[in-house]
């Protein structure tokens, strides 16, 4: 579960979030929608502990996986190793990483390094790594941006399957993406989400 109570966040004199309160129940799938620059990414960065708000409280109950808007991969690791790095040691780890790569259509990229991959391929690997890491809460910041329609459908199906029954918080501009992955949508309005 995620509870946000009267959160305020500013960048200098510009207030981005104003008395924002939100409750995301365990196991629910929630989308945050709004115009660019309204504070969607800032809010999930606060939830992830990457930003400190000016005031208010955030409570996160559970282990969090986060897929950033821009893929963050280790440049010295291959695609499969970027996934494998979050798995505990054991004989099942490599097959799990390979299974996830296959599920997003990247088996042939197994041994490639991030600099050899397109932006969409990197994003799919970042999603695979978050799924491999597991946890109770998945934060997704524009995860399907830049993917073609077939790949978007493939990745959406994987997210629904792998994250069934767990909490998902999605930031998106795309209503069809929100509809595909979430059962509730909050829209930005005057510094908060309603």
Task: Give the ranges of each region predicted by the language model.
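The feature captures the beta-strand-to-loop junction immediately N-terminal to the Walker
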Residues: 33-35
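Helix-to-loop junction immediately C-terminal to a conserved catalytic motif
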Residues: 48
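Conserved ABC ATPase "signature" region
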Residues: 94-109, 159
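Conserved ABC ATPase signature
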Residues: 113-117, 121
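A short, proline-enriched helix->beta-strand linker immediately N-terminal to the Walker B motif
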Residues: 132-136
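Catalytic Walker B motif of ABC-type/P-loop ATPase nucleotide-binding domains
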Residues: 138-142
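Helix N-cap at the start of a conserved alpha-helix in ABC-type nucleotide-binding domains
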Residues: 149-151
């Amino acid at each position: 579960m995620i509870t946000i109570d009267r959160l305020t966040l500013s960048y200098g004199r510009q207030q981005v979030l104003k008395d924002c309160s939100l409750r995301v129940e365990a196991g629910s799938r929630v989308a945050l929608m709004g115009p660019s620059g309204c504070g969607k990414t800032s809010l999930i960065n606060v939830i992830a502990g990457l930003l400190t708000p000016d005031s208010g409280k955030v409570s996160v109950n559970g282990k969090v996986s986060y897929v950033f808007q821009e893929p963050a991969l280790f440049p010295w690791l291959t695609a499969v190793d970027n996934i494998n790095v979050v798995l505990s040691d054991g004989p099942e780890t490599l097959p799990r990483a390979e299974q996830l790569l296959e599920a997003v259509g990247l088996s042939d990229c197994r041994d490639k390094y991030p600099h050899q991959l397109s932006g969409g391929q990197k994003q799919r690997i970042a999603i695979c790594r978050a799924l491999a890491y597991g946890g109770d809460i998945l934060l997704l910041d524009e995860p399907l941006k830049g993917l073609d329609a077939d790949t978007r459908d493939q990745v959406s199906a994987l997210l629904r399957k792998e994250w069934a029954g767990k909490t998902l918080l999605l930031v998106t501009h795309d209503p069809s993406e929100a509809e595909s992955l979430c059962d509730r949508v909050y829209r930005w309005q005057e510094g908060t989400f309603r």
